């Protein structure tokens, strides 16, 4: 039931990662509803994800997109790749990402690829360990991307210059 879709809306890239049918059992039978997992990004270091649930698929997607737009975070990129190798985890999912040379492309699978593409990461090597549940992979990927620190951020935190750190 998982599918991907990309739509341009006010310069944000939107991707639908997964649609799932779920049911609630009540006295009279089952009540079916749908969940949608989406990510949005500006392709330049801002990314967010949303998880929506409704009785109809379009409504679930709409809710997920709204939540994704409201939960956007900014990440530090280095000319389309990461500054340094980084790990992230959420629940049973663990992800590892490392910078890659120009022309490598996004080496990632499924949900992680969607997050990296909308975030504006063009060259990266990545691997998912443990659970490959799309929601947990998305959360772990964003957790890892938030941990990326640019040399300027590290220098400011240490009270040094960028040149002093790179030695």
Curated annotation (Swiss-Prot):
One of its GO terms (cellular component) is cytosolic small ribosomal subunit. Disulfide bonds: none annotated. Keywords: Ribonucleoprotein, Ribosomal protein, RNA-binding, rRNA-binding. Residues 12-75 form the S5 DRBM domain. Part of the 30S ribosomal subunit. Contacts proteins S4 and S8. Belongs to the universal ribosomal protein uS5 family. NCBIfam families: rpsE_bact. This is Small ribosomal subunit protein uS5. It comes from Vibrio cholerae serotype O1 (strain ATCC 39315 / El Tor Inaba N16961).
């Amino acid at each position: 039931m998982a599918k991907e879709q990309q739509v341009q809306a006010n310069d944000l890239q939107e991707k639908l990662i997964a649609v799932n049918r779920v049911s609630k059992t009540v006295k009279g039978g089952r009540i079916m509803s749908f969940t949608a997992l989406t990510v949005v990004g500006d392709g330049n270091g801002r990314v967010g994800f949303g998880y929506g649930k409704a009785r109809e698929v379009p409504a679930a997607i709409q809710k997920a997109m709204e939540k994704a737009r409201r939960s956007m975070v900014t990440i530090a990129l280095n000319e389309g790749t990461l500054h340094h190798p980084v790990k992230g985890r959420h629940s049973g999912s663990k992800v590892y990402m490392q910078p890659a040379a120009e022309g490598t492309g996004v080496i990632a699978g499924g949900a992680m690829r969607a997050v990296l593409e909308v975030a504006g990461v063009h060259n990266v090597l990545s691997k998912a360990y443990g659970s490959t549940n799309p929601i947990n992979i998305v959360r772990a990927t964003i957790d890892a991307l938030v941990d990326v620190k640019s040399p300027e951020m590290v220098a400011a935190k240490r009270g040094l210059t960028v040149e002093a750190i790179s030695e």
